[in-house]
Amino acid sequence: MFGFTARGPLWFRILKGGTIFAKNYKTVLMLLALTAGALLIHGYHAFAEDAEIYLPGVEKILHPELFPAGQEFFGSHANLTLFPNLTVFWLRVLHLPFEAGLFLGHVLSIFFFLLACWELSAQCSPDARTRWAGVALVAALLTLPVAGTDLYILDQYLNPRNLSAFACVFAVTRVLKKQYLWAGLWLAFALSVHPLMPMYTISFCLLLVAMERFEGRAEPKAPVVGSTLAVACLVPLGALLGPPTPAYHQAVQFHSAHYILRWAWYEWAGVLAPLALLWWFASIARARQWRAVERLSLALVVYDLVYFAAALLLSIPKSFEALARLQPMRSLHLLYILMFLMAGILLGEYVLRSRIWRWLLLFVPLSLGMFAAQRALFPASAHIEFPETAPKNPWAQAFLWIRKNTPENAIFALDPYYMRIRGEDAVGFRCRAERSRTVDVNKDSGAVSMFPPLAEEWWEQLQALRGWKSFQKADFLRIKERYGVSWTVLQQPGVAGLECPYQNREVQVCRLP
């Protein structure tokens, strides 16, 4: 009744080994090849971007003496997810060094994500060639920006979203197969590592079930299902109502992704263009009697429209400013995964077929373009930052020196805009240096946008750092007295009167007197 079979899903049967593995070894090898290709195209940066939010929670469990100050800005996320605990468990059980464990975890997250796409493709097409076209297209586009959401399909480093992503795709497959217990288990795992992203998948799975239930009835099903989904989306809003404070308002100004009315025109296109594309997919699938593609496409149209309406609702009235942290347009993450998987399947069926030159004509330029985009995004860093290798980036070099040569309880002052400095490549200080720091406008403001009680502390400290570019020795002594700061990281040429035991061409690490 619940779809819990003795055989289980493909991933479970593969892991069991034996004859099942023998029957699927070609699939496994192909998925491994695509995983390696995805790594080569999109790169790997363990300590970049949102790793600054997620990895300090792992490091805090491994070394409780770390981060005597500012831990609330990453602990607010860490306390809502099992990601730090699962990562520590993974490292300890396998006796892996920290960086090696992160790298292996990232590679496996790509593999399981592509495996999930492969399983879902089986519901869309019976032909292996077209299925591989779909999976390959997704693999080539892993770091494609999802409209204006500040998300990629899959990030270039291990984080909860990557784990949630493959679990959510597995869940959608189970719903299509009416294996609801398996779907529930996958969604439970996804929720345990990321409390927000799976909520969109849950709503989509409910939508799939509801649309099938209404199928064949006289009533117009889409408005009924859409209204039901909208109500489900708005249920948690009551707990979040409350006027935003001035400090909170300042924090969310750094996160235009939360407010669709601030998006650029091409980001709006990333919301509206899929509607036409998915409707077209549904018409093609109907003619071919590809039932799953038709169901997914029509459901995604309703799904997109409902969340688009919710995003507009939360963006227009100022009184709803604090509710924008629900980020309805993050629903596009699942939509993009499914849309590009189906697009690849249709390309494989109608365009690529068995013509090798057509496959090369599509995937070679596409892969080179995605590779070039990543090099432009991380120009001062190695494309794949392998574990335990010396960093190429001067900022990462300075952060690594700090980790090895400064007291674990040291508190550092940094430019609150340091992650936006050209050549810094969005390397996180906390996660790379494993030291406390003053607040920033990139990641700590993100924590504030999700957890409003942090706003006053963040804003007060940010005000104390105002005018950083013109700071002199007296200014550093002032913030030392106020916040216990004992070190600072400065761009060259630095500030006169400070002792700086480490310097490179871009950065100085200075001890405050």
Region annotations inferred by a language model:
Residues M1-G37:
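Start-transfer (signal-anchor) and selected internal transmembrane alpha helices
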Residues L39-E52, L62-L80, P195-T201, A210-Y336:
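Transmembrane catalytic cores of multi-pass membrane glycosyltransferases
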Residues V172-R174, L181-P195, T201-L206, T228-A232:
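Membrane-interface alpha helices of multi-pass inner-membrane proteins
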Residues E349-F378:
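Signature aromatic-anchored transmembrane alpha helix within multi-pass, membrane-resident enzymes
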Residues L377-P513:
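Extracytoplasmic
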